[in-house]
Amino acid sequence: FVYPFLMRSGSRMPVLVMLLAIGFNALNAWVNARWVSEYGTYPVAWLADPRFWLGLLLFAGGLTLNARSDRTLRRLRSGGGGYRVPHGGGFRYVSSPNYLGEIVEWTGWAIATWSLAGASFALYTIANLAPRAMANHRWYRDTFPDYPADRRALLPYVL
């Protein structure tokens, strides 16, 4: 959600797309906050549960991968001169490490909260970003003849 505001681009985002994104994020925030604050029962012992720690580690790792990958993409655009192939970090393995990071991030949230609300958002994130990652990968391969042949779309060595 923050990424478009960090980019300096001559292209415009359609108002409907922006409003739908804001609406979805507001609904998601409300559903997850409501679950955690009213419906979820988290005793203090939950903080020692392996699911909480695994979820927290996945969330932090996904957030880091997402932020670093977005920074790499922003730096590519800052120099002007058209599109270029990103390199380094998660881009060594996949075309859309920012999407992979976001998927890992929200999967971690789902595990840490052990909730239907968290799982629903993780599944939505996968359903939304996996096809976009595949489309980005096709675009890179079609646009750049020397695009790394061993780079996958979303999952290193797999997809």
What are these regions (language model features)?
Residues 1, 19-30, 57-64, 107:
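Hydrophobic alpha-helical cores of multi-pass transmembrane domains in eukaryotic membrane proteins
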Residues 1-15, 28-40:
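Internal transmembrane alpha-helix with an interfacial aromatic "cap," most often the third helix
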Residues 9-19, 47-50:
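Short capping loops/turns at secondary-structure boundaries
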Residues 22-54:
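Long, highly hydrophobic alpha-helical transmembrane signal-anchor segments
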Residues 41-159:
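Hydrophobic transmembrane alpha-helices
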